[in-house]
Structure formats: C-alpha cells, structure tokens
C-alpha cells in the first residue's frame, strides 16, 4: 500500500524499533530490483520518519541499513551480536523489534520459520508483521497463510530499467573481411557483482536502494561503460603482490562461443561473449605480452607475465594453456585505438541497443557464427 504508514490501530510506539529481515539476496545484488524496491518502499512509505532500524551484523539487510537511515530519515540502532551464530542473528533483531518487516522469504528458509513462530504467538503479545506483496519475494502460499494469521502485505513500488534508446545509423556491423583480416586479441568482460572500480561505496548503495539506472551492472552495462570511458580497467592478479593487469586471449573469434565452459564451483561461465577484440600489434606496442606458461611447481612468483599450465578443479584438472593468454600491465587506454584496430563483441542482435551510439568500432554479433565455427551466418 504505497503512500501509507503503519496504521493507527497497530500497537506500535513512537519511533519504533524495526526488524527488516530477509532470506539471502544472492551474489548479484543489481539483479534484485524487486528486493530493493521492497526495501525502499518499507523505509520511505511504510515507516514514519525517525523509526529505529535494527542493525545486526551478518544479516541480509545489514549492508544497506545505514544508507536507508540517511536517505529516508531514520536512525540505525546496532545490536551486539557477539557470540550469536549467523543463523540466529535475524532472531536477535526480531526479538528486539516493535515492528517486523519481511522483504523476501524462501519457501524453506529460516526466515519463513522465524516469522511463522512470531505469528503463532497470541496477537496481543507479538509485534505487527508486514511482508512484501510480490510473488518474486514471497510466494502466494506463504502470503495467503500469513495474511490469515494477521500479517499485513505491502506493495513494493514498481521498477524497471528502461531499454537504452537506439540511435539511427549509430551501429556499424563488422564484416567477414574485418574478422578475417585482423590479428585479434580478445578481452571478454562480465557483469559486476559490486561497485564499479573507483566508485564510492555510498553511491553504489544509493543506486541500488533508489533504483537508479546506474544500478544496472549487467554484462551489457559493463560493456557500455567501457565504451563510454574508452578504457579497460586492470584487475588484481590471483597472485598477491603482482601488479594489476588486463588479460586477453588469442583464441579465434569464431570459436569463442564453443570454448565457453560453465564453472559449477563458481556458479558462472568462465567468460561471457561480450567485450573487445583489439589488434595484437597495437597492444604489443603498448606493452602487452603473451604469458609464460609454467608448471605449478616451477612458478617463480615474481613474474607478472607467468601463468600456471593447470590447476586442480573440483572434479578435474583445468588446462589454462588453451586460453593463449596475453597480459597488459595496468589499464588499457582505448582513446587512440582507431576504428580499424578494434571490434566490439556482443552475443545477440538484441544486445546492439546497448552499444548503439557509444561505439567508434564495428560491432560483431558472435551469435551469427554457425556452431561449426566455419563462417558468419
């Protein structure tokens, strides 16, 4: 019920202590626009200004409460969780609350069991319970049961990032001749699980909570950011102490899709089919070099261009030599990369709208390659 606050018939004192509880958010916060819509609606429209948000370290909502307090005029009260197991920290918040608000509830989650125990207490001896009225956050089964037990639903504000506009004539597609004539090194990007490099933490959190377009950290948004900044940001190497670098692969463009491997232990593909192909000669002139593959026992540890030949995965050994990796120390400044020395890589035709108007380089749709990798369809 957007625009409303806690009703007068709720036994709630002024400036109530509020437990905001939730099942796990997942490793990709920017994907959960529904969750952040529920959080901001609860703080901005359900609660009166000056409410006290209960902070318990290690809970799903904890990273966002300080910013919610600043954005919506609430205080944040920290509860001491020393000696409390991570599994019981929502219980600590709930047991000290005048109001309980459930943002997301898994069907078999501890959050569901916790709220269910609260609702089984006599109405006069329990705090009011609210929950997000959205099937992506709370299942219909749970919502119906809790409503009959006296919990109240609230409607999160609707959010959807608008599709980026496509500028007429702003996309130049790569031709077969461009693909075949270039000696390309490929850099693939991926979605960002956290803030952008150099982005202030508070700005990142505000983007998520307020549902700004800049909260989109998908792989397409990451690629668009690279094109706008004309810079590939170096990342830290797995070996501690070695300088940040940008990695490339000498793998043929037409084989990229067939070379992808899903890494189950990481819950993701080893790379996404989005990024840039850059002239090998252009990169080499700026300090890029092929890595030196060494057996793990022969690694020196002080060579920024060395890479183990293999590593042990959860089920089998992983051979890294097939990546044919090159490495560039530090950021790659793309401002001097001419239109003939680079290609922008996207997976599907539907991705073209994300790079329209931003790319000075031709765009190659990798999905146009036939699965036998022999040609572009």
For each feature predicted by the language model, list its residue ranges.
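Glycine-biased, small-residue-rich flexible motifs in mid-sequence functional cores and linkers
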Residues: 1-170
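NAD-dependent ADP-ribosyltransferases
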Residues: 149-377
């Amino acid at each position: 019920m957007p625009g409303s606050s806690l009703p007068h018939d709720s036994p709630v004192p002024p400036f109530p202590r509020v437990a905001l509880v939730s099942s796990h958010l997942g490793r990709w916060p920017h994907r959960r626009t529904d969750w952040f819509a529920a959080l901001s609606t609860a703080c901005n429209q359900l609660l009166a200004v000056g409410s006290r948000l209960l902070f318990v370290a290690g809970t799903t909502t904890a990273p966002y409460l300080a910013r919610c307090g600043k954005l919506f005029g609430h205080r944040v009260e920290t509860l001491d969780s020393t000696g409390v197991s991570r599994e019981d920290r929502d219980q600590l918040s709930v047991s000290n609350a005048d109001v309980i608000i459930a943002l997301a509830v898994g069907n078999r989650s501890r959050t569901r069991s916790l709220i269910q125990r609260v609702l089984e207490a006599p109405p006069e001896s329990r705090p009011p319970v609210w929950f997000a009225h959205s099937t992506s956050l709370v299942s219909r089964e749970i919502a119906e049961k809790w409503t009959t037990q006296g919990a109240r639903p609230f409607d999160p504000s609707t959010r959807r990032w608008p599709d980026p506009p496509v500028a007429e004539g702003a996309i130049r597609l790569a031709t077969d001749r461009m693909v075949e004539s270039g000696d390309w090194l490929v850099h693939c990007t991926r979605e960002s699980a956290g803030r952008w490099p150099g982005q202030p933490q508070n700005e990142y959190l505000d983007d998520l909570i307020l549902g700004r377009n800049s909260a989109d950290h998908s792989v397409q948004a990451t690629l668009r950011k690279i094109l706008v900044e004309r810079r590939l940001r170096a990342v830290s190497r797995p070996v501690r102490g070695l300088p940040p670098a940008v990695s490339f692969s000498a793998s043929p463009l037409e084989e990229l899709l067939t070379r992808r491997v899903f890494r189950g232990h990481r819950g993701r593909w080893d790379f996404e089919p989005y990024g840039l192909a850059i002239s090998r000669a252009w990169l080499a002139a700026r300090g890029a070099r092929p890595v030196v593959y060494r057996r793990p026992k022969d690694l020196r540890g002080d060579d920024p261009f060395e890479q183990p030949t293999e590593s042990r995965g959860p089920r089998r050994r992983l051979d890294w030599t097939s990546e044919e990796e090159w490495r560039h120390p530090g950021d790659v400044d793309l401002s001097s990369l001419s239109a003939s020395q680079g290609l922008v890589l996207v997976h599907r035709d539907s991705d073209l709208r994300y790079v329209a108007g931003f790319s000075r380089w031709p765009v190659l749709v990798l999905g146009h390659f036939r699965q036998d990798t022999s040609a572009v369809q």
